[in-house]
Amino acid sequence: MRPIKKSRSLKLPKSILEEIGESDSSARRGKRNHNLPHREKRKFARISRGKNGYENRKITEEGDSKSSELNDDYLDAHRKSSTKKKSSQNKQAKESKLLDPIAFQHKIALEEDDREIAHLEKMLGIKSKDKSAHSKIDKEFGWLLEDLDQEIDDIGVPGTEDPSYGHSEDSEVSDDTGDHGSVDELESEREGNSGEEEEEFHGFESNSDEFHQPETKPIRMDPLKPAVPSLPNANVGSKYVPPSLRKKLGGDKESEDALRLRRKLQGSLNKLSIANISSIIKEIEVLYMENSRHSVTSTITNLLLQTVMGRESMLDQLAIVYAALATALYRIVGNDFGAHLLQTLVERFLQLYKSKEKEPLSSHKETSNLIVFFVELYNFQLVSCVLVYDLIRLFLRSLTELNVEMLLKIVLNCGGQLRSDDPTSLQDIVTEMNLLLASADPSTISVRTKFMVESITNLKENKKTKVANASAQSKFEAVNQLKKFLGSLGNRSLNAREPLRVTLEDIEQIETKGRWWLVGASWNNVPSGDNTLSTEALQDKKKSEELTAHSKILQAAKKLRLNSTLRTSIFVALVGSEDYIDAWERVLKLHLKRNQLPEIAYVILHCVGNEKLYNPFYGLVALKCCTLQHNLKKSFQFSLWDFFNELQPDDDSEEREISMRRIVNLAKLYASLVIEAAQPLTILKHVDFMAINAQMQTFLLVFFTDIILGVKDDLQLVKIFENCKAEKNLSSKVDWFLKTYVRKNPLVDNSKKALFKSNLAMASAILQSISKEEI
């Protein structure tokens, strides 16, 4: 890039100079020479003395010194090729310089213009010295070059028309004939000026930005925003749509992945049965690993509800298997699955119930099927009794045919579970029902309504109806088998163990209060002002009371010699609970390992043995343990056999004296477990009936007396003693003990002697028949 001057003096056109004349030109020469810079004066003086022999120097395309540029423009365009005429050409050039010094200054100005034009041509992308390039000049900057050409024409510098100013390459050899000292001096001066001229050039580049359109600067990416280019058709002010709603906005067309997932789940549900439920759960777990959790959860929920709602009559066996599958997935996957299923189920049920409330009962097949499926979910402990009681209160608003049918479905399928979970709420339900019946016309009460009222009343009084139906028996066996399967899931790590405690209000107000199954997602209206202060005071008081009670419980644990941290934690969970259900839930929250489960049985038996009188609370907790955890059931058996070793030690060991209250309380505890089928009668297989001592005799006497008096009906008594078939010769041993010790039991009240004798005779007959079969 050629260096240029930052500014130059004003130049007059040739026509004006001719009009002024020779006299004016001489004065103008003096004035012009006077205003020249110091360096230009020195150059002009050297040229005037004829000491410069360095006019014609070879000009290269990449040269940037000022001397080469001056000599290039100063020489004439027509140079001669012969080397013999070099001296004459140099003389003519010197004479032309001496004749008109003003033309030399104009030549310098012309050189500056050429450099400026070359720079602009380069910036505009135009090849230099190309006349056709004027047609390619941008329309915006064409006026700039046109003015520069006009200015050159006005100056009219001699030498551009004079052929005597040679411009051939051969004439460059004559530069060496001059004075070498003057050449070196000129070279140093030109090199000294190169720095200033480069600075002037950079300044020109900064000013030349005004002649160009501003280029787009690279945009710096924001690290806090995703590096995704904006779409050309995207709306800048459009509202953000979450991924969960994009499918609804995009239409009902499902993707291939969703269809493939739906087919796989549908195939798994079609193969579902009690025998292969474990393998089906493993297949669904694999689908959870391969797909998004929400997709699998929503697809399973829709398929289950569609299958349940699509049947004319819901078979109990099918509802039980589907409910067991849903409960198992709830425990394995977590609260998200169970909450989504329960929320969707109740919403669809309420929608159907409210839309068809006044229609005949025959049009409520879907509603009836959904309530049966919901009841089975409650039986398998996916949902707590709170929501069930809320639905019962909803149905008790009016005794319509639909409400009576819904109440019967609930009472007949899960009445016993409701009574054991919350008997107080059941009493409130009976009270509301009686008030509703009192206000109704007796003539309008149907037979179905009377049967429903009778069933709820019997449930409150714990009167079980005798049902000898084969389907009911098969259903009972299927439920027990699936409950054992769900209990076996405790061997693996589970994400949910407790039933979902949700109310009907939470489900109905999910849009306003938020998702009830997420911690912190629901919103409650907190009162302000004095009410807030009083609430905080009550909370502080409650916390202080809890701390005091907790310290007392720890002291009681020390007195009972529960010194280990694990046993103390189990004791605090049991004693600090509100009821046996709360106690079981607190024990589950400890998340004990498999090898730590026997400690639960140890603490319960230890607490029972130290009570002054038998506390049925521990029996109910033990019943929960044996029913829901097979490992705990075995732990209670092993603990009983250890207790037998204490009661009747071996011949080598000394007999220990055990307190009577411990013997009686433990006998009553295990008798209650045998009555509820939580433990079989074969737990006595290690007892040597022919060599029992007084302590063992007392235990067995209390044990069999409670069983004979505690059974509800003959069928239950038959089931208990038929378990002796599993152990050979156990029936004959038990029969001998009943005839020898139990028949003459003085502890039986006179009011119960008749019942005691009849049940004892039936038990003896059962045992004798088993003994004959073994022979």
Curated annotation (Swiss-Prot):
Protein's UniProt keywords contain Oxidoreductase: no
GO cellular component, one term: nucleolus
Pfam families assigned to the protein according to its UniProt record, in alphabetical order: MA3 (PF02847), MIF4G (PF02854)
Record keywords, A-Z: Nucleus
Positions of region (Disordered): 1-101, 152-253
Biased composition (Basic and acidic residues): 52-79, 177-193, 209-223
Keyword Nucleus: yes
Positions of the MI domain: 565-689
Bias type Basic residues, positions: 1-11, 28-49
Compartment annotation: Nucleus, Nucleolus
Residue intervals of the MIF4G domain: 262-463
Gene Ontology molecular function, alphabetical: RNA binding
GO annotation terms (biological process): ribosomal small subunit biogenesis
Role of this protein: Involved in osmoregulatory glycerol response.
UniProt similarity note: Belongs to the CWC22 family.
Descriptive protein name: Suppressor of glycerol defect protein 1
Higher taxonomy: Eukaryota, Fungi, Dikarya, Ascomycota, Taphrinomycotina
